[in-house]
């Protein structure tokens, strides 16, 4: 299907339901799908979503609450250090998770290809939280966060915003929740989001390697 036809179909797709289903997750398809605002949410079958409205966060609009300041420098930050361990932790800390073995294998492949990235938090060399997602152009497509210690996922988001501020990124948060709103995220229309992707996904990120943003 041509890009223009897919764009038109997505504008008229269900607002709060899967756009389509697929039997498997394929790395190449995921990259293409993300550029059209699609993301997988469940498996067997894989459900693909493009919700309207869409929740995003602009890094320089991050809200840091007063009670968070004591946590910001409490943990060690590592980038792309142990992606596989982080995504597995995201699965294992949830009683019900769409992150199955196929999902982990596919996203780890995207990591080895340079698309998927992780920001990890450590305390005494123990992984205690973080966030992972895909970087395409100047968009960080957030997939999942995890927090073993208090406020670790919030610290991860704050640190991610700090790193991406100089590069004019947006962060795709997918679906609104109050936790994200407290941090400065907000909803925009699907049409506006897709138009942003047209521009941002075709730009250079501004850095060579994500892991080198922390020296």
UniProtKB/Swiss-Prot annotation:
Gene3D superfamilies: Leucyl/phenylalanyl-tRNA-protein transferase, C-terminal domain, Leucyl/phenylalanyl-tRNA-protein transferase, N-terminal domain. GO terms for biological process: protein catabolic process. It is found in: Cytoplasm. One of its GO terms (molecular function) is leucyl-tRNA--protein transferase activity. It catalyses: N-terminal L-lysyl-[protein] + L-leucyl-tRNA(Leu) = N-terminal L-leucyl-L-lysyl-[protein] + tRNA(Leu) + H(+); N-terminal L-arginyl-[protein] + L-leucyl-tRNA(Leu) = N-terminal L-leucyl-L-arginyl-[protein] + tRNA(Leu) + H(+); L-phenylalanyl-tRNA(Phe) + an N-terminal L-alpha-aminoacyl-[protein] = an N-terminal L-phenylalanyl-L-alpha-aminoacyl-[protein] + tRNA(Phe). The keyword Ligase does not apply. It comes from Campylobacter jejuni subsp. jejuni serotype O:23/36 (strain 81-176). Keywords: Acyltransferase, Cytoplasm, Transferase. Disulfide bonds: none annotated. This is Leucyl/phenylalanyl-tRNA--protein transferase. The gene is aat. NCBIfam families: aat. Its EC number is 2.3.2.6. It holds the Pfam family Leu_Phe_trans. Functions in the N-end rule pathway of protein degradation where it conjugates Leu, Phe and, less efficiently, Met from aminoacyl-tRNAs to the N-termini of proteins containing an N-terminal arginine or lysine. Belongs to the L/F-transferase family. GO terms for cellular component: cytoplasm. The keyword Cytoplasm applies.
């Amino acid at each position: 299907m041509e890009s223009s036809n897919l764009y038109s179909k997505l504008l008229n797709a269900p607002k709060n339901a899967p756009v389509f289903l697929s039997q498997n997750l394929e790395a190449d398809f995921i990259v293409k799908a993300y550029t059209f605002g699609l993301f997988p949410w469940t498996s067997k079958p894989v459900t693909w979503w493009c919700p309207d409205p869409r929740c995003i966060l602009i890094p320089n609009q991050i809200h840091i609450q007063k009670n968070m300041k004591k946590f910001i420098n409490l943990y060690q930050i590592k980038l792309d250090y142990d992606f596989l361990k982080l995504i597995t932790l995201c699965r294992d800390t949830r009683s019900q998770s769409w992150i199955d073995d196929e999902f982990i294998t596919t996203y780890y492949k995207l990591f080895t290809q340079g698309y998927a990235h992780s920001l990890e938090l450590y305390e005494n060399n123990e992984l205690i939280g973080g966030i992972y997602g895909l970087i395409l152009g100047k968009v960080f497509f957030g997939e999942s966060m995890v927090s073993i210690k208090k406020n670790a996922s919030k610290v991860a988001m704050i640190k991610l915003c700090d790193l991406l501020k100089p590069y004019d990124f947006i962060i795709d948060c997918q679906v609104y929740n109050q936790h994200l709103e407290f941090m400065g995220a907000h909803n925009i229309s699907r049409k506006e989001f897709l138009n942003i992707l047209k521009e941002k996904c075709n730009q250079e990120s501004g850095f060579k390697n994500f892991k080198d943003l922390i020296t």
